[in-house]
């Protein structure tokens, strides 16, 4: 091995994986990352008990919108940089580098790998927003993209293009930067599977000190709060769907039952590990999602399948104006939708990025970015076209609840669309099952990620730790719903999104650090 290749590897530092860990009560955790992270979580829960949920939501919402309003340009420009960075790596000689070394073999089949990264990356969001978002843009539910006239033919076209913009290349580029950086420094340089390892070329041994501690603690909090938010809001949405399909009262009791069932199944999954748990559930997820897509596409083929070229062309034609943060005439829509999404994707990136890295050994950089960036974007074009195109068609032709009243409840929009389709009840039941399976994949993969960070980058920490974090996600979600309902959960979401500001700078630094590391790999 040449000197250049060793420059940023584990061999160039005295640090060893897990050297700062403490083994106690069956745990093997990093000191101080685990302790400080747990302390912040406890502090948040105490504050939630002491403070009024409405007051907390108002305060954190104020912080969130202050950040979004003041740094909208930064989020958008950074997102553009990440897309360009990833596309450049695909075509550059660096794309030939194999994660894990030239002789590394992929741990998972291509389809299982795609299933896992897609379930972690988008998951339940596609279920609810693939109908609600295009309808919202078309009808002007909360303004319209680029100031287009609501309910016009151009609005229908741009609604699909703008929805695709929010779920296409940009979010996957954000995830791709984090995932590739972690995978490269872990599998090619032998560093711990932890966020701090990415910055070893920039920080040197300071990465193992407080600079690294802060990065890892931020990643833990953003991931845990993001997952708890997803579980809390998702439980409310799932309960609404169950009520719509089966008539069960969608109150706090049903929401807690949903979270409990999801958490218990996630615990079973994390105990079985990636091969026996996460991979199996992700594969089931992909099959059920594909089944739902095919059924809806065939039933509403004229409106749904016919929207695919419209969505693709609208996305391509409008990606530049939608990516431009300056001189916008649609500022309310721009900040309320695009900038909010970018902040959410960035705050979500430590979780998704680390999980993708965990399952991506053996892929070349070119194969990795193509799979992480291009393949999900193509799948999302089809998904958004089928569901969004059919939903807009119902609005235009005054069909069903969507046609009569437009978007009235985001969590019910998909089920309302199914109501007027043949076999609508069957489609709704499949959708409820898929929502629950998406929950499980988010919870189990998130537990693996948090466990790795709080274990100092170890991937073989005690099973008890993974179980602890899976229960913690569910417990926080239940506690917040119990204390303050949706307002408490939305307060947590606002807090999680606020971490996007420091993480934007962290991700930009990742690009620099990754290039430094990859250049030595080529020597």
Curated annotation (Swiss-Prot):
It comes from the Bacteria. Induction: Induced by NaCl upshock. Its main location: membrane. It is a multi-pass membrane protein. This is Glycine betaine transporter 1. One of its GO terms (biological process) is amino acid transport. GO terms for molecular function: transmembrane transporter activity. Keywords: Amino-acid transport, Cell inner membrane, Cell membrane, Membrane, Stress response, Transmembrane, Transmembrane helix, Transport. NCBIfam families: bcct. It comes from Vibrio parahaemolyticus serotype O3:K6 (strain RIMD 2210633). InterPro entries: BCCT_CS, BCCT_transptr. Belongs to the BCCT transporter (TC 2.A.15) family. PROSITE patterns: BCCT. The chain crosses the membrane at residues 33-53, 71-91, 109-129, 165-185, 214-234, 251-271, 286-306, 337-357, 372-392, 420-440, 467-487, 496-516. Involved in the uptake of the osmoprotectant glycine betaine. It is found in: Cell inner membrane. GO terms for cellular component: plasma membrane. It holds the Pfam family BCCT.
């Amino acid at each position: 091995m040449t000197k250049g290749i060793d420059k940023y590897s584990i061999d160039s530092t005295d640090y060893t994986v897990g050297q700062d860990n403490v083994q106690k009560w069956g745990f093997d955790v990093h000191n101080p990352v685990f302790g400080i992270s747990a302390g912040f979580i406890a502090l948040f829960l105490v504050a939630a008990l002491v403070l009024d949920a409405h007051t907390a939501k108002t305060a954190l919402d104020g912080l969130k919108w202050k950040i979004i309003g003041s740094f909208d340009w930064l989020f958008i420009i950074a997102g553009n940089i990440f897309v360009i960075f990833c596309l450049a790596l695909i075509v550059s000689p660096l794309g030939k580098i194999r994660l894990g070394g030239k002789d590394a073999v992929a741990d998972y089949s291509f389809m299982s790998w795609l299933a896992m990264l897609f379930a972690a990356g988008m998951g339940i969001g596609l279920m609810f927003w693939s109908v609600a978002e295009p309808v919202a843009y078309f009808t002007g539910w909360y303004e319209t993209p680029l100031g287009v006239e609501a309910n016009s033919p151009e609005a229908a076209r741009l609604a699909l293009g703008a929805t695709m913009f929010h779920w296409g290349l940009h979010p996957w580029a954000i995830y791709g930067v984090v995932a590739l950086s972690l995978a490269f420094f872990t599998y090619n340089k032998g560093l711990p599977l932890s966020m701090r390892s990415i910055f070893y070329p920039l920080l040197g041994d300071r990465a193992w000190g407080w600079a690294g501690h802060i990065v890892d603690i931020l990643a833990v909090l953003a991931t845990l709060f993001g997952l708890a938010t997803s579980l809390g809001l998702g439980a409310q949405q799932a309960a609404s769907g169950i009520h719509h399909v089966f008539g069960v009262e969608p109150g706090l009791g049903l929401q807690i039952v949903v979270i409990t069932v999801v958490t218990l199944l996630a615990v079973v999954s994390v105990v079985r590990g990636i091969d026996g748990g996460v991979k199996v559930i992700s594969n089931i997820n992909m099959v059920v999602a594909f089944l739902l897509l095919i059924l809806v596409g065939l039933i509403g083929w004229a409106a749904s399948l016919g929207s695919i070229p419209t969505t693709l062309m609208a996305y391509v034609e409008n990606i530049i104006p939608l990516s431009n943060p300056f001189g916008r005439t649609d500022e309310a829509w721009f900040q309320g939708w695009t900038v909010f999404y970018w902040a959410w994707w960035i705050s979500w990136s430590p979780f998704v990025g680390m999980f993708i890295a965990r399952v991506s050994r053996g892929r070349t950089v070119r194969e990795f970015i193509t799979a992480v960036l291009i393949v999900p974007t193509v799948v999302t074009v089809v998904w958004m076209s089928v569901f969004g195109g059919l939903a807009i068609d119902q609005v235009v032709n005054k069909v069903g609840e969507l046609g009569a009243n437009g978007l009235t409840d985001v969590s019910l929009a998909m089920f309302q669309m199914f109501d007027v389709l043949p076999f609508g009840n069957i489609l709704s039941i499949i959708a409820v099952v898929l929502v629950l399976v998406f929950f499980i994949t988010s919870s189990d993969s998130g537990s693996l990620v948090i466990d790795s960070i709080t274990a100092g980058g170890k991937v073989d920490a005690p099973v008890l730790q993974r179980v602890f974090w899976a229960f913690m996600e569910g417990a926080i979600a239940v506690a917040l719903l119990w204390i303050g309902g949706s307002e408490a959960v939305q307060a947590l979401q606002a807090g999680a999104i606020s971490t996007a500001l420091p993480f934007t700078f962290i991700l930009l630094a990742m690009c620099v650090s990754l290039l430094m590391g990859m250049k030595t790999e080529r020597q």
